[in-house]
Amino acid sequence: MKKIIIIVFAVLFLSNSHGQTKAFTVKVTGKGSPIILIPGYSCSGDVWNETVTFLQNRFECHVLTIAGYAGTAPIDTPILKTVRDEIIKYTQINKLHKPILIGHSLGSFMSLWVSSTAPGLFGKLVCVDGMPFLSALYDPNANADSLKINPMYNPEAIVKNFENLPDEGFITNTAKAMMMQVNDTARARQIATWQFNSNRRTLGLTIIELAITDLRKNIQSIQQPILVLGSIYLTKENSYKQIGDQFKLAKQVTIHVADSKHFIMYDQAEWLYNEIDSFLK
């Protein structure tokens, strides 16, 4: 009961800090050493439901949903930087002892960002198909400073594009596109529904903030072991090369690639659980 009261207090504190809506919602289940699970772009924390079921008998799982995603109230820009700072505050206020960080996609990026910002505060990291610099995945020569002044990465223009998307057909069309990232049609529709329920401005601002933030040098400061679980980028060999290039400055990194699309927790759940289990032992 005392733990629950502390967590509720922390969430209330974060919601009032700087006069803003809280940067994320939190659902806490299980008992044991703490784990913070961060979902990917536009997703609800429910994307981790099955993973939490696997972990909750041994770990206390703090599952986040980022503000503006999947029906949660949005916050002002800079969104992801605010989320980073408030994850650190949340960990400190709740006196979580070196919580393990597990992130998917954008959530992996956030895990790397918070851990490199506060290196002594967090434990091991599990990055599920996420990179320190998304843009370099598509262009190895990408430069964050150049992208910031590139008209194609203008945040307000991207926001406008999202806001102009019609509601009619949004879920159906997005679900079709999501079949490139997950095998199951029901899962694809759920992911599409989370995106439909997300704040359009948040969708635009966060994808740009993610694209123009390069953490490849920052991760040198992370002292804890990092497990990177990748999906197939054209070929498994190419996946290992792409991931290895991005994490080459990490002090302790293990890279494994699944025979999977992007949502590994859905396409290769047992493989994911085994990898996490072995890494956390």
PLM features per residue range, with description:
Residues 1-23, 225:
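Bacterial Sec-dependent N-terminal signal peptides
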Residues 97-140:
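Conserved hydrolase catalytic core segment
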Residues 226-260:
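Conserved loop-alpha-helix segment in the C-terminal half of the alpha/beta-hydrolase fold
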Residues 161-220:
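Conserved alpha/beta-hydrolase catalytic His-Asp/Glu region
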Residues 125-165:
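Flexible "cap/lid" loop of the alpha/beta hydrolase fold
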Residues 28-73:
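Conserved HGGG/HGGXW glycine-rich cap/lid loop of the alpha/beta-hydrolase fold
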